């Protein structure tokens, strides 16, 4: 895994720098997201691990992606195929998103709750996290019934567990001590 991240970093940096220069960061993220999903396809994974010539592999990959990739995105695929690095596309996407977040001074914040939160609740969480992290935040909302009630908020290494499940687990720990 760390090998792929090391391999992915220069590709992500090159793609990000190009995207910023051409004011197409959103488009590039969409292309990389699609390409990363294609690599996760079972048939494509077999193709990637096969002994195809890089040109054939690149053209097959580009054909599967169709119009989701522009000419520059196709060039990235060709270069990565030539170097045998198409398997690293999910990590390239991850690194690209990280570079974008750093560039835009935003933080990804996961909000996990038992039920969907209202816009007002999300706005309060967003404002509180922006104040705490001193940067803009992008909320990724997930629903997990095992939370029972309340909310779990994660950003990087920070976890704020305000869930009933978390409180019950802490209570059980105290009672067992």
UniProtKB/Swiss-Prot annotation:
<keyword id="KW-0375">Hydrogen ion transport</keyword>
<keyword id="KW-0406">Ion transport</keyword>
<keyword id="KW-1003">Cell membrane</keyword>
<dbReference type="GO" id="GO:0005886">
    <property type="term" value="C:plasma membrane"/>
</dbReference>
<keyword id="KW-0813">Transport</keyword>
<keyword id="KW-0066">ATP synthesis</keyword>
<comment type="function">
    <text>This protein is part of the stalk that links CF(0) to CF(1). It either transmits conformational changes from CF(0) to CF(1) or is implicated in proton conduction.</text>
</comment>
<keyword id="KW-0997">Cell inner membrane</keyword>
<comment type="similarity">
    <text>Belongs to the ATPase delta chain family.</text>
</comment>
<keyword id="KW-0139">CF(1)</keyword>
<keyword id="KW-0472">Membrane</keyword>
<comment type="subunit">
    <text>F-type ATPases have 2 components, F(1) - the catalytic core - and F(0) - the membrane proton channel. F(1) has five subunits: alpha(3), beta(3), gamma(1), delta(1), epsilon(1). F(0) has three main subunits: a(1), b(2) and c(10-14). The alpha and beta chains form an alternating ring which encloses part of the gamma chain. F(1) is attached to F(0) by a central stalk formed by the gamma and epsilon chains, while a peripheral stalk is formed by the delta and b chains.</text>
</comment>
<dbReference type="Pfam" id="PF00213">
    <property type="entry name" value="OSCP"/>
</dbReference>
<dbReference type="InterPro" id="IPR026015">
    <property type="entry name" value="ATP_synth_OSCP/delta_N_sf"/>
</dbReference>
<dbReference type="GO" id="GO:0046933">
    <property type="term" value="F:proton-transporting ATP synthase activity, rotational mechanism"/>
</dbReference>
<protein>
    <recommendedName>
        <fullName>ATP synthase subunit delta</fullName>
    </recommendedName>
</protein>
<dbReference type="GO" id="GO:0045259">
    <property type="term" value="C:proton-transporting ATP synthase complex"/>
</dbReference>
<dbReference type="InterPro" id="IPR000711">
    <property type="entry name" value="ATPase_OSCP/dsu"/>
</dbReference>
<comment type="function">
    <text>F(1)F(0) ATP synthase produces ATP from ADP in the presence of a proton or sodium gradient. F-type ATPases consist of two structural domains, F(1) containing the extramembraneous catalytic core and F(0) containing the membrane proton channel, linked together by a central stalk and a peripheral stalk. During catalysis, ATP synthesis in the catalytic domain of F(1) is coupled via a rotary mechanism of the central stalk subunits to proton translocation.</text>
</comment>
<dbReference type="InterPro" id="IPR020781">
    <property type="entry name" value="ATPase_OSCP/d_CS"/>
</dbReference>
């Amino acid at each position: 895994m760390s090998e792929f991240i090391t391999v992915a970093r220069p590709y992500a940096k090159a793609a990000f720098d190009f995207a910023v220069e051409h004011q197409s960061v959103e488009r590039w993220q969409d292309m990389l997201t699609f390409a990363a999903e294609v690599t996760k396809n079972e048939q494509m994974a077999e193709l990637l691990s096969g002994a195809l010539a890089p040109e054939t592999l690149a053209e097959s990959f580009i054909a599967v992606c169709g119009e989701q990739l522009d000419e520059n995105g196709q060039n990235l695929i060709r270069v990565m195929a030539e170097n045998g690095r198409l398997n690293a596309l999910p990590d390239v996407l991850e690194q690209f998103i990280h570079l974008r977040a750093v560039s835009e001074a935003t933080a990804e914040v996961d909000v996990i709750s038992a039920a969907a939160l209202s816009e007002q609740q999300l706005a309060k969480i967003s404002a509180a996290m922006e104040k705490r992290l001193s940067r803009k935040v992008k909320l990724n909302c997930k629903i997990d019934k095992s939370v029972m009630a309340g909310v779990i908020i994660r950003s990087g290494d920070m976890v704020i567990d305000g869930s009933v499940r978390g409180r019950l687990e802490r209570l059980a720990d105290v009672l067992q001590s």
